[in-house]
């Protein structure tokens, strides 16, 4: 690792840089570029239909072998479909934002992934 601190250790990245999960601007290309550069790339799922999210996750996995994450806004109308895709695609790190849901998140809690609420 280039820098050793709690962030780099927690996410297994080289640089303590976490890309924001920006709705329209942070698809697979930006996320994989940030991850390949040593930071934590994040796919912003807020503007994506479920199958578009799946495509972005799969393309990220093809473009990098390094850790990446998905930012999942809790206000998204098809939240459960997004959660199912994140589980099926075995996304290693998930950030949830824009609120807290009391139901529907149990499947994420059961997965072996890192989950953070923003």
Residue ranges of model-derived segments:
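Active-site entrance/lid segments in N-terminal catalytic domains of soluble metabolic enzymes
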Residues: 1-118
């Amino acid at each position: 690792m280039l820098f050793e601190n709690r962030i780099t250790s927690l996410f297994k990245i080289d640089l303590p840089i976490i890309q924001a999960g920006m709705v329209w601007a942070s698809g697979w290309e930006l996320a994989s570029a940030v991850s390949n550069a040593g930071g934590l790339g994040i796919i912003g799922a807020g503007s994506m239909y479920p199958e578009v999210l799946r495509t972005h996750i799969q393309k990220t996995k093809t473009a990098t072998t390094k850790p990446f994450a998905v930012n999942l806004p809790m206000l998204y109308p098809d939240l459960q479909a997004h959660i199912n895709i994140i589980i099926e695609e075995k996304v290693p790190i998930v950030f949830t934002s824009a609120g807290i849901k009391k139901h529907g998140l149990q499947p994420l809690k059961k997965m072996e992934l890192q989950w953070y609420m923003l």
